[in-house]
Each structure stands twice: as structure tokens, then as C-alpha cells.
Amino acid sequence: MVAVARGTLRRTPLYEEHRALGARLVDFAGWEMPVQYAGIKAEHEAVRTRAGLFDVSHMGEVAFRGPDAERALQRLLTRDVSRLGEGQAGYAAVCLESGGTVDDVIAYRRGEGFLVVVNAANREKDLAHFRRHTADLDVEISDETEEWALLALQGPEAERLLQPFVAGDLSALGRYRFLETHVDGGEAIVARTGYTGEDGFEVFLRPAEAPSLWRRLVEAGAAPAGLGARDTLRLEAGMCLYGNELDEETTPLEAGISFAVHLHKEEEFVGQRALQRQRERGLRKKLVGFELEGRGIARHGYPVAVGGERAGVVTSGTMSPTLGRAIGLAYVPPETEGGFEVLIRERPVPARIVPLPFYRRKRNDPEGGASG
């Protein structure tokens, strides 16, 4: 799958498609990836109103096989994967014994085994962590990143555009469910998952088959979209980004993803005791959404002041293309209510805490349809 470019940068199977479309390519986690094509705002709007197509082949895929595959993931992930049925996926965190977050992932149950999608920048770290904590189990852990290309088709028209290429009824596919089927004639996995806050699908297929499907979806009306729009979309949807909202010094409870933490499953997971203590004793910090009430845009790393004292940090911020307001995520002391100030070039700008997500789509998909 992977070719080498500009020193050590890797390229996805769609690199030539990106060049042909005039994409601006950047180094992202060691991959030469498209950050934008027509422009971030236009691509963002296309996903919210029609459908956008992303190349996310840089994401890592790790397969778990063998008699202890499920037990291994019960030990490694915060989610109770024993509850996942065939064709079902689940979002989870991977933790250190301290409770800090190694990564956030999605696990797909495939028969007796699993496919786990990890963040590109964390792939090697994750593999080492997985193997270190399961050395006593009968499980085969394989890096299959180079065996898959991954396309994400997101937006209200995603189902209509993808259905002609899929052997299977997408309208019956619920949120976090997937089909092992044929797409455009080749073997593929089609999942109703995403990272945008819209309905949509992620399609795993063999690298050699990815360019053809990409071109046919673009011809059908999907707008090519880059990592820039992917970031503004996920921020409006209140979704965490590893390296911003999540890191090894931050627990899943602090990051507000406790829905993916199952503290009472039979197999104790790495970091479970630390998270149980934190739940009993209280958080050190909490993640909140905010809107600026003054001029400016909050950016990653800007300080936060509560009661005139520096007490937190902005993790993500942008001018929301959908809402037309400056929004962001920040860590603040757990007792913080109402609002705070963001220091933009040392100038305090009032910010109001608001509920997450900033944007919630109107649902008209089948029961349990994707939130993106």
C-alpha cells in the first residue's frame, strides 16, 4: 500500500488522486495527506449539506485473532467488547495503568476476532502496548495497516451516493454497525461510523481498489474533503482529537468520554483501578465546550483564566463554519461553571461554557443511525 515520498513521508493509495484534484498536501503523522482541496469552508459545508469524501488511509488497522482475542481486548480497552455482536463496532479508550490515555480507538468484531482502528501517530506505540500487556495470552496481534485503504463518505447524501456501489442494504445498517460485503466489485467492510457529526460511512477496501471507488464517488457528486475540514467538523460535533483533548496525562473521564468506559466488566482493563479511584475522589480537570463572547479565535494551547488566575488551557478552537461563532474546547478546574476568560495574545476574552456538541444534525436515518 505504502510508497515513500519526500524523505520518510508515506503516501496512501490515493496520493495521485489528490494531486490530480489540486490538493494542498501536508505532513500529518508521517503521511503526505491532503489538508484541503477547494477550501476548508466549502468542504465543511459540503459535508453538512450534501456529502464529502475523505481519504483516511493513514489510520492504523490492528487485527486480533486466536482463542484469547476477546480476552485480550477486554484487558486493553475500556469498553466491554463482550457486548459487541457480529457486525458491531464500539468506541473505546486504551489506558496506561495510571489511567492516562494511550489512544482512542474503534474495535470491530469480525467473527471470533477483531479489527481495531488506531490513530496514525500512535500506531507503533499502540502495538507495543498491546503486545506488552497480552504476552501471557493466546492471541495473534497483526499490524494490517498496509493491507487496507480507508475512505470516509460523510453527509446527509452519503447513503444515496454509496448504495449503488454496495452489495447490501445500507438503509438497514444502524449506527456503529458494519457489513462485510462487496463494494464496486471488490471485498470490503462498510461501517456506519465517522468523525464529522453527520450520517456517513467508512469503507475499508484493498489498496489497489481504492482509486476507482474514489473517482466514481467524486463523479457521483461527493466533494473531496481534506483534514482541515475533518477537524472543524469533528470540533463542531464535540469529538476529541488525540494530542489535543486526549493524551497520556489525561484520563477518559476527564475528557468526557466516560460513555466508553465500562468499570464493571469481568476482565479488568489496564488503568481500571486508577479510573475507579478518580471516579470516587473526583476529577482533576474537566473538558468543556465554550463560545467566545468577544473578538478573536481561541487556538490550541491558549491559556484559560478563571477568576483572574490562569487555571486551564484551550485544546481546540476555530471559527465555526456552520454556526458563525468562535467555539472551542478547554480543560478547566472541575468546579468551574458559567464561563472564564481565554488569553488571546495575553488579552483576556470572555468565554461562555456551552453544552456539547456545538452542532447536532437532524436525524432522519434508521434507528441507531450514525452520528458520524
Swiss-Prot record:
Catalytic EC class: transferase
UniProt KW Transferase keyword: yes
Gene3D superfamilies: Aminomethyltransferase beta-barrel domains, Aminomethyltransferase fragment, Probable tRNA modification gtpase trme, domain 1
GO molecular function: aminomethyltransferase activity; transaminase activity
Enzymatic reactions: N(6)-[(R)-S(8)-aminomethyldihydrolipoyl]-L-lysyl-[protein] + (6S)-5,6,7,8-tetrahydrofolate = N(6)-[(R)-dihydrolipoyl]-L-lysyl-[protein] + (6R)-5,10-methylene-5,6,7,8-tetrahydrofolate + NH4(+)
EC identifiers of the protein: 2.1.2.10
SUPFAM superfamilies named among the record's database cross-references: Aminomethyltransferase beta-barrel domain, Folate-binding domain
Annotated keywords: Aminotransferase, Transferase
Assembly information from the UniProt record: The glycine cleavage system is composed of four proteins: P, T, L and H.
Name of the protein: Aminomethyltransferase
Encoding gene, per UniProt annotation: gcvT
